[in-house]
Amino acid sequence: MSNVQTSAEREIVDLSHLAFDCGMLGRLKTVSWTPVIAGDSFELDAVGALRLSPLRRGLAIDSKVDFFTFYIPHRHVYGDQWIQFMRDGVNAQPLPSVTCNRYPDHAGYVGTIVPANNRIPKFLHQSYLNIYNNYFRAPWMPERTEANPSNLNEDDARYRFRCCHLKNIWSAPLPPETKLAEEMGIESNSIDIMGLQAAYAQLHTEQERTYFMQRYRDVISSFGGSTSYDADNRPLLVMHTDFWASGYDVDGTDQSSLGQFSGRVQQTFKHSVPRFFVPEHGVMMTLALIRFPPISPLEHHYLAGKSQLTYTDLAGDPALIGNLPPREISYRDLFRDGRSGIKIKVAESIWYRTHPDYVNFKYHDLHGFPFLDDAPGTSTGDNLQEAILVRHQDYDACFQSQQLLQWNKQARYNVSVYRHMPTVRDSIMTS
């Protein structure tokens, strides 16, 4: 009778690890990843401290911090190649890798150092792309499809991908293809009432898909159903934690700095994932995103920029608000120095649903506060996508130094996995 071991009891495996990381504001950073096996039960309890680099001036506003944990099956990355790989077993063809640049930090966006061969597993790169495309880009933006990390520009490879500003009137507009009018042809001297109702119904379903259903799962949800994350190869969001990072002002006490003060931000955090059953081989990825609220001393209320106020602008008439089509405005209508060429489409009377922040213009004359010096998009031309994505360069003047970039984090990721795996002793004592 053979004594070859062919199975193992399900035991707990401690995969806890420390992570010392840093990044740029507004860029999506992988802070931890764990490969998992079919049948695993995964638990995560992350604790640590997040710091901003030393601020040049006193602490003015808190920053918004988001942590996300996703599960991505390898099948979503490799497709049929993965299925054949598992069928063939030890005789399977090796899975491909992707090419990185030769610099050690050019795979930082997926939370690893570039190995000596300048290649990393494809599942790390493609899983990050899938997460970004499904959750962190506006649906009307083009997908990121770079085949290799070496195809990324230097900032994206080192500092990760740019994300949108926190939502407000100018950073979350309607899709650019939004229609402002809809026409229906009719026969002379007559109106087809039934055809008119049908046209209304068709317009309604088109608008629903344009504004709220640009992804398959949203369409199915509108029918009262739901889709598995497998339906569109979507990474599964397992847990999301968000909080505001606050701090304190430090007064200078020595002779050279007496009377001066600067801001310090240190925020402890906890991000926990309850026990999650892993249905098939894949990777658990935890990502962080830190952003300041987008505030500009040159922003003003939409009504303040209107030289002639109409009834529709000011009255807030429910009959008009509920029936008028979206309105097209420009950044010039919202910022003193806004570009008139950046057009956005917004719901009618959106200025009665939101209100801009106000900053005294004296702040504009001072450097070092976490405010946008210019209207978004001023330096990038009439490009709406560039305007609503965070530029970390806009916040460079806030920090005394960026030796650890704009934020840094020290954390312990307490990871426990219940897994069918022989003990180390069994692996050493072959047969």
UniProtKB/Swiss-Prot annotation:
One of its GO terms (biological process) is symbiont entry into host cell. GO terms for molecular function: structural molecule activity. One of its GO terms (cellular component) is T=1 icosahedral viral capsid. Disulfide bonds: none annotated. Coiled coil: none annotated. The keyword tRNA processing does not apply. Its main location: virion. It is found in: Virion. InterPro entries: Capsid/spike_ssDNA_virus, Microviridae_protein_F, Microviridae_protein_F_sf. SUPFAM superfamilies: ssDNA viruses. Transmembrane segments: none annotated. Keywords: Capsid protein, T=1 icosahedral capsid protein, Viral genome ejection through host cell envelope, Viral penetration into host cytoplasm, Virion, Virus entry into host cell. Pfam families: Phage_F. Assembles to form an icosahedral capsid with a T=1 symmetry, about 30 nm in diameter, and consisting of 60 capsid proteins F. Upon virus binding to host cell, one of the spikes dissociates from the capsid and the virus interacts with LPS through the exposed EF loops on the F proteins. After the genome had been ejected, the channel formed by the F proteins at the unique fivefold axis remains open. Belongs to the microviridae F protein family. Pentamerizes and interacts with H protein, G and B pentamers to form 12S pre-assembly complex. By binding with protein D, induces joining of twelve 12S complex to form the procapsid. The procapsid has an external scaffold made of 240 copies of protein D, 60 copies of the internally located B protein, and contains 60 copies of each of the viral structural proteins F and G. Upon genome packaging, interacts with protein J. The mature virion is composed of 60 copies each of the F, G, and J proteins, and 12 copies of the H protein. This is Capsid protein F. It comes from Escherichia phage alpha3. The gene is F.
